[in-house]
Structures are given as structure tokens and as C-alpha cells.
């Protein structure tokens, strides 16, 4: 029996999404894995969870069963210290950091696990950090010859000192409409579609409430498509392109992703998408991703333009990633990810 330590929750705004992903995984994981659920509260406390609530978008609560990580590298064993002072040890083979957003998919938890020499599922420190920071994603991918949208970076600490200068430079460089988003947030938190100049300052302030810096880029009148990638027996497998039909907002926001009904169109029926698998694979390898990821593109008249890379895509029942592989059940998608990571552990 293989033992999987499942990390979920976390300190980011995507805490509840991580919770829902963990709940879905627990319901569908195959019997050859024993799962050790370790939740991270919104305050950053690691707690051992003997059960996970059936609430779809729940919250990790401090139940008094605190988790103590190993004090030496290479030890795959946690200590659970109970509220009354008693403790016990739990061994594991592999960690799955099923975390979204900052302190989860930005390289921080990956760095902790690397320091402890603990094997884990998903991309390492560099790929996680580079993919989470949209500014550096654009720099790295544009240098690799992958088309990206032009962008303007506003660092939070400089915004209030040079507000008028930033606004002038943006209006000189771009034509409206624009799209403003935090540089390091996920699930569309802090994103705003900006039609007019007067809306721009508020949109930037909103983005900076959700991230350390903000990105401004053209708001394309172009469909967004999604390509999921998974390593299967050492071979990178690309899904068909997915288009999401949704109503309401002008972009695929949090409500559309997790709360409102949507329709997945697989494969997406658009011209100018030839070679998408090669482009997605190039992005995956350029950043050094591993095991699984999701690459998001805009479909323009001249072809695909990279939007974002997600090294820890949502694994809820409503998420794009597990739905992308039409020939695979949810449980097969999870098993393929775990098998890819476990094979590397056993080498």
C-alpha cells in the first residue's frame, strides 16, 4: 500500500478551492493509496484531518491535531501532536501539495519539501515560482519565442508614489479596453476588465489588494482556450483544446469557474490553433514543469498567444483539468499524476 500525504487548504484566497480539490481527490483515489490528509488553516497551521467535510468549498479548521514536520532531511514521517499532549507518528511515501495561490503553488511549499528532501507531486521551486508570477512568465516565454501579449508592470510599492506617471505611460502605450490583474494571484481574483481610462486607477488598486504587483495588458476580443498536460509513463500527453461557455462576466472569473453552470466544448472549434500541442509542450519544458499543468491561450487571427501557466490547476469536479481528458475518468487522471510522481521517487 502506498501512502500519500495530501496537503490542502492554505493561506491564499484560493483556500476553499484547494479544499474542494482535496475532497474530490479523496472521493475518487484508487484503493492502492492510503491518504493522510493534512490541512493548512488560513493562519498557516498544519493540522492532521481524520475526516474532510462534505461541504464543497469548506475551510480547514484548527482541530488541535498539530503536524510537526521532520527535523532531518530524508525522513518521511510526520508527528501529530494532539491537544491533550499525546502524539503519534505517521509515515508517508509521497506528498501531494494540492494547494492553489500564494504559499502553495508559488514555490514556497515546494522549497520547504526540497529542503527536507521529501518527494512531492508537481513542479519544483523554479517552475512554480516562474509560472505564478505572470511578469516573469511573460519574460521567460517571450525569450523562448512563444507569443505573449504586451504588458505593463506596476509594482505595488511604487504605485502610490508615481500614480500619475504610471497612468500616462499606460494610456500612451495601449488603447482601451484593457485587462488589469494581480501579478501573482489565481482563480481570477483581483482581475478587472477596463473599458475607459477613468476606470483604470480603481482597477489597479483592486489588483494590488490581491497581489504584490499588477499587470496591465490589452483586453483581446478573442476566445480563451485551455490545454491540460500530464506526464504518462515518461511521455507528455496533451489534452484537446477546451473552450468554456459561460454567461455573466466578460471573462472566465471565479463565479464562472466554481459557482455557476458552464459548458466545456471539447475539442474547441476555432481556426488558427494548429500546433497547439507543440506550443504547450514547449511552454511546459521551458519552465521546467513536471507531472501536470494547464496552459491557457488566446486564439487570435495570427495564432495562439500565451495567457497563463497553471502548475497546480484545480482538481474539483467542475475544474477544466480533469474534464480535458475525455478518454479518462477522474480517478484515472489522478492515478496518472500520482504514478508519474511515484515513478520518479522509486528511481
Curated annotation (Swiss-Prot):
It comes from the Bacteria. ATP binds at residues 171-226. Binds 2 magnesium or manganese ions per subunit. It catalyses: 2 D-alanine + ATP = D-alanyl-D-alanine + ADP + phosphate + H(+). Its main location: cytoplasm. The keyword Mitochondrion does not apply. The keyword Cell wall biogenesis/degradation applies. Its EC number is 6.3.2.4. Residues 138-339 form the ATP-grasp domain. GO terms for molecular function: ATP binding; D-alanine-D-alanine ligase activity; metal ion binding. Mg(2+) 2 binds at residues 308, 310. Pathway: Cell wall biogenesis; peptidoglycan biosynthesis. Keywords: ATP-binding, Cell shape, Cell wall biogenesis/degradation, Cytoplasm, Ligase, Magnesium, Manganese, Metal-binding, Nucleotide-binding, Peptidoglycan synthesis. Mg(2+) 1 binds at residues 296, 308. PROSITE patterns: ATP_GRASP (PS50975), DALA_DALA_LIGASE_1 (PS00843), DALA_DALA_LIGASE_2 (PS00844). One of its GO terms (cellular component) is cytosol. GO terms for biological process: cell wall organization; peptidoglycan biosynthetic process; regulation of cell shape. It is found in: Cytoplasm. Belongs to the D-alanine--D-alanine ligase family. Cell wall formation. HAMAP family: Dala_Dala_lig. This is D-alanine--D-alanine ligase. It comes from Tropheryma whipplei (strain Twist) (Whipple's bacillus). The lineage of its organism: Bacteria, Bacillati, Actinomycetota, Actinomycetes, Micrococcales. The gene is ddl.
